[in-house]
C-alpha cells in the first residue's frame, strides 16, 4: 500500500485532534493534573469507534502547547533564535495512546500558524516568514520523535493558510521541511473556506489534505473540480463549533455527498476541526454518530 493509502479500510474515521479537557482527581493528578484528561480523551475516542485516534491534545491550545517548550520563545513573545525543544513535546501522551490503541496520529502545530500566533520581540527575525522557517526546523525534531514512537500518521495543523494572511510559498517550504523529514504518511489540516488558496495548497507535498465540509459546504464544489493526484482527503463532516449533536442520518447524508464527488477509498471521515471547546458529552456523541454514519455508508457501497 502506498503512503497515500496507509489504512486498509474504506471511509476510515479519525479526529482532527483536540478533545475537551476532563480533569480527574486522585493521587495521579497530584503528579500530573492532566493525566486523567489524556486517559479520558483516548478512552472516549476508542469508545466512539474512531479508527485513528489522537492523544486528545489536552495540554494547551495549539500555540501554547508547542511555543511553551521551544527555546527562543517566552509566553507568546519570540525573544531569541528558535531552537528545538530540549525533550519531545507530545510524545509521552502519544505513547500512552498507543498503549491503548494500535493506530494513533501524531500532531504538530504548523510553522506558519505558530509564527502568526506569536509576537516577534527580537531583531533576530525580520518577519513571520523567517520565523516560520526556523520554527519548521525546530519542529522537524518533534516530527522525527513522533515517527520513532510509531505513529501511523503525522498531521501538521495549518489553519492560518485559509485566511490569506500567511505567505503560501513560505508555508509550503516550511511544511515540506517537516513532511520530508519523516517516512510515514503526512497530513495537513486547513480549516475554513479554501476557495482563494486551494490551487496553492494542493501543491504542498503531503499525503492527505484535511478540510472542513460541514460548515463550509462550498469546499466540496471547490475540491470536486480539482485533481488530488493520488492524495487522500480528510473529509470534515461534523460541525466542531457547536454542542448540538448531529444525528446519524444527518452525518450519513454529508458523507454520501462526499462519496458522490470522490472515490470513497480516498476519504478519511472526521470532524471539521478540533473538539477542545465542546462539552465532553457533545464531543463523544458527535464522534460516535459520525462513526455509525460512516459504517452505514460503508456497508451500502
Which positions does each model-derived feature cover?
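Domain-level signal for soluble alpha/beta catalytic cores
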Residues: 1-301
Amino acid at each position: 500500500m502506498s503512503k497515500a493509502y496507509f489504512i486498509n479500510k474504506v471511509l476510515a474515521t479519525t479526529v482532527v485532534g483536540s478533545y475537551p479537557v476532563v480533569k480527574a482527581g486522585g493521587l495521579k493528578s497530584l503528579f500530573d493534573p492532566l493525566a486523567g484528561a489524556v486517559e479520558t480523551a483516548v478512552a472516549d475516542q476508542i469508545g466512539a469507534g474512531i479508527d485513528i485516534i489522537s492523544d486528545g491534545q489536552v495540554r494547551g491550545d495549539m500555540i501554547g502547547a508547542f511555543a511553551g517548550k521551544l527555546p527562543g520563545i517566552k509566553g507568546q513573545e519570540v525573544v531569541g533564535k528558535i531552537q528545538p525543544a530540549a525533550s519531545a513535546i507530545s510524545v509521552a501522551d502519544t505513547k500512552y495512546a498507543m498503549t491503548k490503541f494500535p493506530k494513533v496520529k501524531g500532531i504538530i502545530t504548523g510553522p506558519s500558524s505558530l509564527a502568526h500566533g506569536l509576537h516577534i520581540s527580537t531583531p533576530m527575525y525580520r518577519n513571520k516568514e523567517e520565523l516560520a522557517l526556523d520554527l519548521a526546523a525546530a519542529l522537524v525534531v518533534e516530527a522525527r520523535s513522533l515517527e520513532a514512537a510509531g505513529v501511523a500518521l503525522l498531521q501538521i495543523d495549518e489553519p492560518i493558510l485559509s485566511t490569506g494572511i500567511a505567505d503560501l510559498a513560505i508555508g509550503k517550504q516550511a511544511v515540506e521541511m517537516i513532511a520530508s523529514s519523516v517516512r510515514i504518511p503526512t497530513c495537513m489540516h486547513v480549516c475554513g473556506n479554501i476557495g482563494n488558496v486551494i490551487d496553492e495548497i494542493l501543491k504542498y507535498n503531503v499525503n492527505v489534505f484535511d478540510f472542513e465540509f460541514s460548515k463550509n459546504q462550498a469546499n466540496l464544489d471547490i475540491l470536486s473540480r480539482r485533481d488530488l493526484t493520488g492524495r487522500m482527503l480528510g473529509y470534515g463532516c461534523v460541525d466542531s463549533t457547536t454542542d448540538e449533536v448531529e444525528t446519524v442520518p444527518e452525518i450519513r447524508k454529508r458523507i454520501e455527498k462526499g462519496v458522490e464527488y470522490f472515490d470513497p477509498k480516498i476519504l478519511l471521515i472526521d470532524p471539521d476541526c478540533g473538539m477542545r471547546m465542546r462539552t465532553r458529552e457533545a464531543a463523544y456523541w458527535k464522534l460516535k454518530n459520525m462513526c455509525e454514519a460512516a459504517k452505514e455508508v460503508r456497508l451500502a457501497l
